[in-house]
């Protein structure tokens, strides 16, 4: 990971819809957003829609920390709970790249799309692997997080860590 820490036995949960074309040129990647999962991504595609399983091979990858992929609640004991390492969007995209290339044999992505933090991952895909990504469609996302958002998230974090059993 970017931090230099290791996430032992890391698992990226994902689902697919549609069929991969013989040329492997119909891949649409839908990362998940903060608090989202592959289930929430199902609303972004469907029959006769812009993203259609009849035409596209859709891969929906769950972010680390969302409960489906390796998360503070299901990680190895050494990194469970409050010991869970900081994971960046870079780390998520790097591991997604390994999933697509090493496990699924994909070399090209037609579209990476997503909203909020999934859109931020679309930006990262284009920056980290520009030769692999044809198009990105980030919406309600920014390429850089504003200072205001950091302050907002500190408030959320403070509410969680104020719990007496936070470190248990």
Predicted regions: what they are:
Residues 1-168:
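Ligand-binding pocket scaffold of soluble enzyme catalytic domains
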């Amino acid at each position: 990971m970017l931090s230099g820490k290791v996430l032992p036995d890391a698992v990226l949960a994902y689902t697919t819809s549609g069929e991969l074309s013989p040329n492997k040129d119909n891949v649409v990647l839908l990362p998940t957003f903060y608090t989202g999962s592959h289930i929430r991504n199902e609303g972004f595609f469907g029959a006769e829609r812009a993203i259609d399983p009849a035409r596209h091979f859709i891969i929906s990858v769950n972010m680390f920390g969302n409960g489906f992929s390796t998360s503070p609640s299901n990680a190895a004991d050494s990194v469970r709970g409050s010991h869970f390492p900081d994971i960046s969007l870079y780390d998520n995209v790097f591991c997604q790249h390994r999933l697509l290339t090493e496990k699924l044999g994909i070399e090209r992505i037609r579209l990476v799309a997503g909203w909020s933090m999934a859109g931020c991952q679309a930006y990262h895909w284009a920056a980290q692997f520009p030769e692999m990504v044809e198009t990105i469609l980030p919406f309600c996302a920014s390429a850089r997080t504003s200072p205001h958002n950091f302050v907002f998230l500190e408030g959320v974090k403070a509410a969680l860590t104020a719990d007496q059993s936070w470190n248990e």
